[in-house]
Amino acid sequence: MLSILPLAYSNFSRILQYFEQLPVVDKMTEEILKQGVGIVETSLTFEPPFCESFERISIDNFPIFALGKEISKEDGIEAMKKYVTSRFWFTYRRDFSPIGGTGPSTDQGWGCMLRCAQMLLGEVLLRRHIGRHFEWDIEKTSEIYEKILQMFFDEKDALYSIHQIAQMGVTEGKEVSKWFGPNTAAQVMKKLTIFDDWSNIAVHVALDNILVKEDAITMATSYPSEDAVKLIMENGLVDKNRLSLSPGNIIPEWRPLLLMIPLRLGLTTINPCYLSAIQEFFKIPQCVGIIGGRPNHALYFVGMSGSKLFYLDPHYCRPKTESTAKMYAEKDSTATTDDVGFSHLEELVPLPSQTADVYTKMDDSTYHCQMMLWIEYENVDPSLALAMFCETRDEFENLCETLQKTTLPASQPPMFEFLQRRPKYLPKFEPYTGVSMKIEMKEFDDIGAANVKIDDDFEVLDVHTEEEDADEDNDDDVANA
């Protein structure tokens, strides 16, 4: 067994296949066979995805605050476990369609921050469409819940899939399969939400440790321009179901705002002076967590008790979940196989739970973690991003007041600077409203047609020698005479 240890970092799936061929001779082999690649990774890399289980946690400091929810000693640790389990848990997956057609078919080893971004965004969508502090019921789900979950499936046509996030990262200078930092993840979320008409969320990323209230308001009241790039389906057509969000299309003045604040709270280790401020942050009703982790080991932080931060860990690899849309199409002989691009996000695809006479409930158990994990504050990487979600303008005003009166004064120096207006020394704030560069392919449809002279649309430049120019001048003189 020790002879295969050097292979651990290169190919976990081969190790798993090796063990599957062995008889169960001891407890460790049995555990590996049960947990698969995840346990092999845990045992051999010393970066266990589950460093502490619920049963081993001793909580001395109550109340616990999780994403703005207070859990008292009377509620007990079980209430916290249930709350953590109700959050979306997106982890490494394997065997999905190659990203970009020829790219990786698993995100194991590089996609942890992308998965944390998915978990954060999943929490935002739950609040947007269902409400705060969603409680998951393993026996029952709603259509809205399933629609949200579909948006994160590991498929190229799911809006918040690993495929879309990885490819959008290229616009931020990150090649596919390269590790993201918190700021890159925030920027990618800002760009992807532009295409989510259903949620209509604005994302503001505050840079340089400065939150300017005026800028956040501008972002929340801006809409993608009419000439912004539209989603292009694989057949080359613009998806007509997903037109731009313009003031003429949407009446409300305020778009629900996801506020992201990337920070670096120390050089190589997190500064102890910010502990109280982080504790206060998790008390804020608008808190939707922190994406950060350990160096090159991203985690999604959802709560805090004393110096312990509770988190969801994406470092657990599973096979790709079978698409419920594909399951339905295979069973329904009338289902079309045409590529519909992103339109299925607007027109809900029938899911198993909605066709109970034929199907059983969709198995979403792998998207919810049954264990509660924690890390000491001192072990957290100083590079992280705070996230807050304001459904209404009133919630945003309340958040600003809380930040100024409670959260920021809790540490000296404060975690970041809060300003009412943009300083004159900073360039003008330009809200991101999509890329204003839409090419109409029909303009090129007539190229090559028999009745089209391409040269007619261009100025023809002839190159003459000096002798030819002189001859032409003489000819002109003769003609004029």
Swiss-Prot record:
Listed InterPro entries: Papain-like_cys_pep_sf, Peptidase_C54, Peptidase_C54_cat
Main location: cytoplasm
Catalytic residues in the record: C112, D313, H315
Alphabetic keyword roster: Autophagy, Cytoplasm, Hydrolase, Protease, Protein transport, Thiol protease, Transport
Domain of life: Eukaryota
Alphabetical GO biological process terms: aggrephagy; autophagosome assembly; mitophagy; piecemeal microautophagy of the nucleus; protein processing; protein transport
Cellular component GO terms, alphabetical: cytoplasm
Keyword Hydrolase recorded: yes
Region (Disordered): 462-481
Localisation per UniProt entry: Cytoplasm
Reported impact of G293S: In bp418; defective degradation of pgl-1- and sepa-1-containing protein aggregates in comma stage embryos
Pfam families per UniProt: Peptidase_C54
Enzyme class of the recorded protein, top EC level: hydrolase
EC nos: 3.4.22.-
Catalytic reaction equation(s): [protein]-C-terminal L-amino acid-glycyl-phosphatidylethanolamide + H2O = [protein]-C-terminal L-amino acid-glycine + a 1,2-diacyl-sn-glycero-3-phosphoethanolamine
Annotated function: Cysteine protease required for autophagy. Cleaves the C-terminal amino acid of ATG8 family proteins lgg-1, to reveal a C-terminal glycine. Exposure of the glycine at the C-terminus is essential for ATG8 proteins conjugation to phosphatidylethanolamine (PE) and insertion to membranes, which is necessary for autophagy. Its cleavage activity is functionally redundant to atg-4.2, but it cleaves lgg-1 precursors more efficiently than atg-4.2.
Stated family: Belongs to the peptidase C54 family.
Protein known as: Cysteine protease atg-4.1
Organism for this UniProt entry: Caenorhabditis elegans
Lineage, broadest ranks: Eukaryota, Metazoa, Ecdysozoa, Nematoda, Chromadorea
